Amino acid sequence: MKIESLDLPDEIKRFYENSGILELYPPQAEAVEKGLLEGKNLLAAIPTASGKTLLAELAMLKSVLNGGKALYIVPLRALASEKFRRFQEFSVLGMRVGISTGDYDRRDEGLGINDIIVATSEKTDSLLRNETAWMQEISVVVADEVHLIDSPDRGPTLEITLSKLRRMNPSCQVLALSATVGNADELAAWLDAELVLSEWRPTDLMEGVFYNGIFYCKDKEKPVGQPTKDEAVNLVLDTIKEGGQCLVFESSRKNCMGFAKKAVSAVKKTLSNEDRETLAGIADEIIENSETDVSSVLATCVRSGTAFHHAGLTTPLRELVENGFREGRIKIISSTPTLAAGLNLPARRVIIRSYRRYSSDSGMQPIPVLEYKQMAGRAGRPRLDPYGEAVLLAKSYEEFVFLFEKYIEAGAEDIWSKLGTENALRTHILSTISNGFARTREELMDFLEATFFAFQYSNFGLSAVVDECLDFLRREGMLEKDPDALVSTVFGKLVSRLYIDPLSAALIAKGLREAGTLTELTLLHLICSTPDMRLMYMRSQDYQEVNDYVMAHAGEFSKVPNPFNIAEYEWFLGEVKTSLLLMDWIHEKPENEICLKFGIGEGDIHATADIAEWIMHVTAQLAGLLDLKGAKEASELEKRIRYGAAPELMDLLDIRSVGRVRARKLYEAGFKSTAELAAASPEHIAVLVGPKITERIFKQIGRREAVSEFSDIEPLEKGSSDGQRTISDY
């Protein structure tokens, strides 16, 4: 099916033809035939790189040009940024594109001026909770990676959000994009959608197992040279020799880094002079953005053409790695499975070095087939690679047979709703009532019967869980006591708007009521004791140190569990460890020191602080509403967590481009406020932070003196990025 034959305005056809897209892939053509451009609901369950995003674009553009508004929902912030950059190309068609991924208690009415809005599932849910007016104007909703409805963490939010959007806008077109799953027909039936189910790919995918020096596919065998003792390194070299790149998936961050380092000496020999020059520039940027031990290792790897990628890296470092790979300079990325979750980063060959993952419940277990398929789907770059290869590694013949049967010859599992637990339902029941979607128990059950959970399980067990949630919400003062009506209290409405688990809100309110003196530690531990906080893992070497700290500061905790209750006490120690990380952060301990002390990555610091800033903001808001002590202290701590600094630096940190390191440098040099900066000479400031930053500072504080005449002045200390970031950038 040709682009020119589609029922689209000529300017859209020209846009794609000028981009080199003249003809639709078979699954795309099937989607058009099944009503994609006629406003029909559609589920596309097709492999990675088979053109799902183009389907979304065509549906959105058609709808917007007919006066509608499009919402594109993604599971990850990184994926939101990627799609936003892509959709901004539609500006030549007169389209306005917006993005929203954070600040969960804002309406973001300004986003409504856009024709296409990209948002995460959580942000979309919060926009609904805050009754954002333009949400009622949505004419087409795209749910990307909709198979993640199976995820215990993200699935319930996506499921409820889709249910609310469909009820709010019954005529709205829903386009769901999914990996190939076992029960795609069931998911399509729930969405009242036409199903496009296909295994077609634009590049052939050869899936197989590497054993004893040979890559075995279903219908062929391919010997691979063995220049080194590591089979995966040999597979990497074989790929580079044929002009390709590799993604290597590992089960842990440690293994990621280890393999990237292991491959350095071999990959370095394959680089051209141009590769080396470009990679040196990328490595320098990595060092400029971060001065931790991990970033130093990453820079060393990148200079040799290898890299690693995991959540312990900051967003800027991950983006540098991704861009270097897309440009073809970085030959191999060793990654945890997070890279398989939606980012557009294909490679000639995907190597899955470990197919087992650790579970606290059952130890090392084989990954699901669906997860394998997501990783394997990254093999083969459309229009660039003649084929793609997905390789599992076997150490024995028995393992070889197992891998073929488990992954190569098997289909993906069915996906199942994870909505039917009290933990999942508690927050969504409150928001459903607060938004007016349900005013009685009968209306609430009617709404929940439209969810995927009810579609799969009917009402089995749902009624009892709903009653438990309603009892909890009434008991904690978030719902009125009226047994015949469901009405949120002012407290309940605020909890819903703040996008916090009602249990977290109840724990915060109880903690503030019962606390004696509120210290930094008291408030930090209070937010770390909520289910919304992501806790640090307790290593064996942590127990004694954290326990000693608890004994020395017992009076600052609202309650210390009995150490003989082992499970409860260990959980408590994890809360304390996380509190201590935040304590070090707000007292300006260097990031590398924090990383080494807690056994984490720089990205973990920022992710933890990001969540903590949000929960501390919630704490300040709840304390203010309920007239509890701690509102002022929590508000001050919220800002300190945002910047990772002591109170005296807050005035300086209100200036963009001044982060915790530069603020401390300016403060120690005698410039303790924006007023003192305004009275200073540009030359003096430039010696401290450099001319570029000085120019930015002076523009913001109302002095636009040119600093170009002293552009040769270097700052006293080099190494910090020109664009220091706050937590919200991560």
UniProtKB/Swiss-Prot annotation:
Pfam families: DEAD, Helicase_C, Helicase_dom4_arc, HHH_5, HTH_61. It catalyses: Couples ATP hydrolysis with the unwinding of duplex DNA by translocating in the 3'-5' direction; ATP + H2O = ADP + phosphate + H(+). Its EC number is 5.6.2.4. ATP binds at residues 28, 46-53. The gene is hel308. Residues 33-199 form the Helicase ATP-binding domain. PANTHER family: ATP-DEPENDENT DNA HELICASE HEL308, DNA POLYMERASE THETA, PUTATIVE (AFU_ORTHOLOGUE AFUA_1G05260)-RELATED. It comes from Methanosarcina mazei (strain ATCC BAA-159 / DSM 3647 / Goe1 / Go1 / JCM 11833 / OCM 88). Monomer. It is an enzyme of class 5 (isomerase). The keyword Membrane does not apply. This is ATP-dependent DNA helicase Hel308.
